[in-house]
């Protein structure tokens, strides 16, 4: 079994009040069953899209979840990932670098 490696990033350089896309990319995990949730201030974001699950040469899996959003400087954006290799769901914070 392989633990997911997770990255949270925006499609474009972040600026408060400007529309953007928040991505959460999980890769290198096995088995393929995984839960990935984009959240704003601890609440699941609306309109999240899920790419097709794909796999790498070593048969580990990867998946991208993304959502349109307009970053605000006082909101906290995170990605919660749950997988059987994790004792509990892990939360990864987006660092906007405003």
From Swiss-Prot:
Functional summary from the UniProt entry: Component of the class I major histocompatibility complex (MHC). Involved in the presentation of peptide antigens to the immune system.
Pfam families: C1-set (PF07654)
Subunit-level organization: Heterodimer of an alpha chain and a beta chain. Beta-2-microglobulin is the beta-chain of major histocompatibility complex class I molecules.
Gene3D superfamilies according to UniProt: Immunoglobulins
Alphabetized UniProt keyword annotations: Disulfide bond, Immunity, Immunoglobulin domain, MHC I, Secreted
One cellular-component annotation, GO: extracellular region
Alphabetized PANTHER family for the sequence: BETA-2-MICROGLOBULIN, MHC CLASS II-RELATED
Entry-linked CDD domains: IgC1_beta2m (cd05770)
Residue ranges annotated for the Ig-like C1-type domain, each copy included: 4-92
Protein name: Beta-2-microglobulin
PROSITE patterns from the UniProt entry: IG_LIKE (PS50835), IG_MHC (PS00290)
Cell location: Secreted
GO BP: antigen processing and presentation of peptide antigen via MHC class I; immune response
């Amino acid at each position: 079994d392989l633990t997911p490696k997770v990255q949270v990033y925006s499609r474009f350089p972040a600026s408060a009040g400007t529309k953007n896309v928040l991505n959460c990319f999980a890769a290198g995990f096995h088995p393929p069953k995984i839960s990935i949730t984009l959240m704003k201030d601890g609440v699941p974001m609306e309109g999240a899209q899920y790419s097709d699950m794909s796999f790498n040469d070593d048969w580990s899996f990867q998946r991208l979840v993304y959502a349109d959003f307009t970053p605000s400087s006082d909101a906290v954006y995170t990605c919660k990932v749950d997988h059987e290799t994790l004792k509990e769901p892990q939360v990864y914070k987006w660092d906007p670098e405003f």
